[in-house]
From Swiss-Prot:
Its EC number is 6.1.1.7. Binds 1 zinc ion per subunit. Keywords: Aminoacyl-tRNA synthetase, ATP-binding, Cytoplasm, Ligase, Metal-binding, Nucleotide-binding, Protein biosynthesis, RNA-binding, tRNA-binding, Zinc. InterPro entries: aa-tRNA-synth_II/BPL/LPL, Ala-tRNA-lgiase_IIc, Ala-tRNA-ligase_IIc_anticod-bd, Ala-tRNA-synth_IIc_core, Ala-tRNA-synth_IIc_N, Ala-tRNA_ligase, Ala_tRNA_ligase_euk/bac, DHHA1_dom. GO terms for cellular component: cytosol. It comes from Nitrobacter winogradskyi (strain ATCC 25391 / DSM 10237 / CIP 104748 / NCIMB 11846 / Nb-255). It catalyses: tRNA(Ala) + L-alanine + ATP = L-alanyl-tRNA(Ala) + AMP + diphosphate. Belongs to the class-II aminoacyl-tRNA synthetase family. Catalyzes the attachment of alanine to tRNA(Ala) in a two-step reaction: alanine is first activated by ATP to form Ala-AMP and then transferred to the acceptor end of tRNA(Ala). Also edits incorrectly charged Ser-tRNA(Ala) and Gly-tRNA(Ala) via its editing domain. This is Alanine--tRNA ligase. It is found in: Cytoplasm. The gene is alaS. Its cofactor is Zn(2+). Consists of three domains; the N-terminal catalytic domain, the editing domain and the C-terminal C-Ala domain. The editing domain removes incorrectly charged amino acids, while the C-Ala domain, along with tRNA(Ala), serves as a bridge to cooperatively bring together the editing and aminoacylation centers thus stimulating deacylation of misacylated tRNAs.
Length: 891
């Protein structure tokens, strides 16, 4: 049972046998806490259960939770690889009680597991309790039989946990394993506690109080249990290892990296192998959970982790991308416990390979500058922070890589001057921005929201209603009236007009009263839930308090509804075809078309696009009902609803479902095939979409792809236009639509043949009469100081053929220089110069070709002494360019 996979299974099965529900690990991107960078503890997915906001169908749970600590307050990145127990990615084993059992049962379950199931000797175990937790102290004596000398009272935050400044909190009790006196260090609470002899393997949190704003801590009506045991630490103890990196999982990863680089796992580069093994896990699991490298947020943290590992791969002598080649080993070790690794393996490998390929250029440039700037420094010196900032700001070389590269030489970085340089740059950026009228105008909406309250939205039920003008805004200020011809904004007490949000554009239409007509050209949401109608008064005068008839443009709204529903179907179809890593990165839902951006880092093939389109249209043709329901946000997520990360959702959310639960790919407990949290407007049945036609696929950023599509009438018009173009083309080719591909292929082959023949004819024409070159009678061959120069201007010959002609000319001359200028239809010119071997000590083809390039308006040229090429935009000066070569030879 000592293998990591066996230990994980034993832990979960033990608690399952004791009435706990085995709950899968939640993603590394927290679903219910937008303030948290990454999931960093087992209790994160149960946070709302502990606070009473969420109810689950079980009161006891057990998990092995994926965790990352590499950003913000919990940042272990700099220590990884250099200590025995720091990791960016780790698994947290845990058991939880939500108002069921409490302190006595938690201690009993933990003690039996570590001593009976895991077989750890009791005399190697020590427990800590909070300084005034007499109950836990007595229970450890009673249940575990520990002597008082091995139950240590600890004051401070290490043994008292709280969720925040207020809320559930309680004392902790930790179990420590004693590695023995061969390892330096003392028990917890002693002056030597920072040594490695005593290792914490399990933390039991007894949530029994609620901290109030006044600082008091009354008892919770239902106390709960939250425990956490680091799997890697537990495995090290059970495998008789003092170092986490010596457990079977890491040994496999480190050995694979060592085999690929030739490094010794126990040699001087041991830390680099450990960094690669650890960071491979973090990178792979983050990518599998939908995070891709970028320059902000979670993507930036991922990029830092990846690039730190890639820096260490370079230190090991890797000349080609390395990390992607290790993914198979990771999948073999952890893929059974975490199937998402297997599903996302192609994406993980491709992302790592591409990122490492890109980073090598940055790394080489940055290291070169770093070596140059630090050459005079010795151990104990500080590297200039301003230079470190220049490396970061100008060359994209992260600060932590600068620190890491200098660390091996015992050189630090002046962080104070680095921070000063960073702040100076920010100040310059602020000073260079003078603000805008638009930004100033935006400031009005927050006080208006405070005064008027939220606008009631009626648009899910109707496109026409009545409303009362609550406020008028003109030129960024409240106005008493809006007159005919004036533009401004209107806030109503209620509206059927949808305000732009969630990628869906705002509605247009009219606001009407007797003698008054206001054309709405856009509707926006300001200050959260204030609907603002932008437009122009076409007739009459508007004033606050006026009652208006509100009419949304029906045809435009219908087209938007179809496009929004189609976006949901395409999102799910993309996930079905490309994998579970697909995550929305942005969208545009307009009446004319839709656009959907998503995490994926390689182009989608034509076959994949066709499959995505077919799957989405199958759901359209089923004409199933599109259902919307209001649900508690956590109930919706439990039912499989997908949320757009970054969106803030209230306690109650709108859930839009399409497609039957019996469709392939629908979750067993889902509300439908496509289930998303969405506040937009949608069709009533999928058939109302009409048709979905994907018309574009492209890259918009690193790791982000975009598809564009049409629906309904727009899709039909697009299809009809394409068919008509095909028919016209078939007519011109005198063939049928079915035979047109073969006809085009035949014509293309014929064209290639003719182009080859034309190229050969041009080359023969260009070199015509050269056989007489040795006699000096050939046109284009001149004598320059006793040296033969074959100088010719030709048309329509490509650069590769021009080089071939130059080689041919050199052979024909025997001894001499060949200069050929080829002009093209766009007026540009290419020039090639060849020098026979006997003359390269006198004339350099590179020097001669650069003289010609100057005349042609080009910028230099390059090649070898015997053959060089260049170009320029001014082909009309081909003759002058040849004369310049002759002059350079001494004519």
């Amino acid at each position: 049972m000592s293998g990591v996979n066996d230990i994980r299974s034993a832990f979960l099965n033990y608690f399952a046998a004791n009435g706990h529900q085995i709950v899968p690990s939640s993603p590394l991107v927290p679903r219910n806490d937008p303030t948290l960078m990454f999931t960093n503890a087992g209790m994160v997915q149960f946070k709302n259960v502990f606070t009473g906001v969420e109810k689950r169908p079980y009161q006891r749970a057990t998990t092995s939770q994926k965790c990352v600590r590499a950003g913000g307050k919990h940042n272990d990145l700099d220590n990884v690889g250099y200590t025995a127990r720091h990791h960016t990615f780790f698994e947290m084993l845990g058991n939880f009680s939500f108002g069921d059992y409490f302190k006595d049962r938690a201690i009993e379950l933990a003690w039996k597991l570590v001593t009976q199931e895991f077989g750890l000797p009791k005399d190697r175990l020590t427990a800590t309790v909070y300084i005034d937790d007499d109950g836990a102290f007595d229970l450890w004596k009673k249940i575990a039989g520990l002597p008082e000398s091995r139950i240590i009272r600890i004051a401070g935050s290490d043994n008292f946990w709280q969720m925040g400044d207020t809320g559930p909190c309680g004392p902790c009790s930790e179990i420590f394993y004693d590695h023995g006196d061969r390892i330096p260090g003392g028990p917890p609470g002693s002056p030597e506690q920072d040594g490695d002899r005593f290792v914490e393997i399990w933390n039991l949190v007894f949530m029994q109080y609620e901290k109030l704003p006044d600082g008091s801590r009354p008892n919770l009506p239902k106390p709960s249990i939250d425990t956490g045991a680091g799997l890697e630490r537990v495995a090290a103890v059970l495998q008789g290892k003092h170092d986490n990196y010596d457990i079977d999982l890491f040994v496999a990863l480190i050995r694979a990296a060592a085999d690929l680089t030739g490094a010794d796992p126990q040699g001087p580069m041991k830390a680099s192998l450990r960094v690669i093994a650890d960071h491979l896990r973090a990178s792979s699991f983050l990518i599998a959970d939908g995070v891709l490298p970028s320059n902000e947020g979670r993507g930036y943290v991922l990029r830092r982790i990846m690039r730190r590992a890639m820096r260490h791969a370079q230190l090991l002598g890797a000349r080609e991308p390395l990390m992607w080649r290790l993914v198979g080993v990771l999948v073999r070790e952890m893929g059974e416990a975490f199937p998402e690794l297997q599903r996302a393996r192609p994406l993980i490998e491709e992302t790592l390979r591409l990122e490492e390929t890109r980073f090598r250029k940055t790394l080489e440039r940055g290291l070169s500058i770093l070596d140059e700037k630090s050459a005079s420094l010795k151990q104990g010196d500080m590297f200039d922070g301003e230079t470190a900032f220049t490396l970061y700001d100008t060359y994209g070389f992260p600060l932590d890589l600068t620190q890491d590269a200098l660390r091996a030489r015992g050189i630090g970085v002046d962080l104070a001057s680095f921070t000063d340089a960073m702040e100076q740059q920010k100040a310059k950026a602020r000073a260079s921005w003078s603000g805008s009228g638009e930004a100033a105008a935006e400031s009005i909406w927050f006080p208006l929201r405070e005064k008027l309250g939220a606008t009631e939205f009626l648009g899910y039920e109707t496109e026409a209603a009545e409303g009362v003008v609550a406020a008028l805004v003109k030129d960024g200020e409240e106005a008493d009236t809006l007159k005919a011809g004036e533009s401004g904004a209107i806030v109503l007490n209620q509206t059927p007009f949808y305000g732009e949000s969630g990628g869906q554009v705002g509605d247009t239409g009219f606001l009407i009263a007797d003698g008054v007509r206001f054309r709405v050209t856009d509707t926006q949401k300001k200050a959260g839930d204030l609907f603002v109608h932008l437009g122009t008064v076409e007739q009459g005068v508007l004033a606050p308090g006026m009652a208006l008839a509100l009419e949304v443009d029906h045809d435009r709204r219908s087209a938007i509804r179809a496009n929004h529903s189609a976006t949901h179907l395409l999102h799910e179809a993309l996930r079905q075809v490309l994998g579970d890593h697909i995550a929305q990165r942005g969208s545009l839902v307009a009446p004319e078309r839709l656009r959907f951006d998503f995490a994926h880092n390689k182009p989608i093939s034509a076959d994949e696009l066709r499959c995505i389109e077919d799957i989405a249209n199958d759901v359209v043709l089923e004409n199933g009902e599109v259902t919307t329901r209001l649900m508690a946000v956590d109930d919706a997520r439990e039912a499989g609803a997908r949320a757009l990360f970054g969106e803030k959702y209230g306690d109650e959310v709108r859930v839009v479902s399409m497609g039957g639960t019996d469709r392939h790919g629908a979750a067993s407990n889902a509300l439908g095939w496509s289930v998303e949290l969405c506040g937009g407007t949608h069709v009533k049945r999928t058939g109302d979409i009409g048709l979905i036609s994907v018309v574009g696929e492209s890259a918009v950023a690193s790791g982000v792809r975009r598809i564009e599509a049409l629906t309904g009438h727009q899709a039909r018009h697009h299809a009809n236009h394409a068919i008509q173009l095909a028919k016209t083309a078939a007519g011109e080719l005198r063939t049928s639509l079915d035979d047109m591909p073969a006809r085009i292929a035949s014509l293309m082959e014929e064209r290639k043949k003719l182009e080859r023949e034309l190229s050969e004819a041009r080359k023969k024409l260009a070199m015509g009469g050269a056989a007489s070159a040795s006699s000096g009678a050939t046109t284009g061959v001149r004598d320059v100081g006793g040296i033969k120069l074959m100088a010719r201007s030709v048309e329509g010959i490509e650069i590769k053929d021009l080089k071939s002609l130059a080689d041919q000319g050199k052979k024909q001359l025997g001894s001499g220089v060949v200069a050929l200028v080829a002009t093209s239809g766009d007026g540009k010119a290419s020039v090639v110069v060849g020098v026979t071997p006997d003359l390269v000590t006198r004339f350099s083809a590179v020097d001669l070709v650069r003289k010609a390039s100057e005349v042609l308006g080009g910028k230099g040229g390059g090649g070898k002494p015997d053959m060089a090429q260049a170009g320029g935009p001014d082909g009309a000066k081909a003759g002058a360019a040849l004369d310049a070569i002759a002059a350079a030879m001494g004519a």
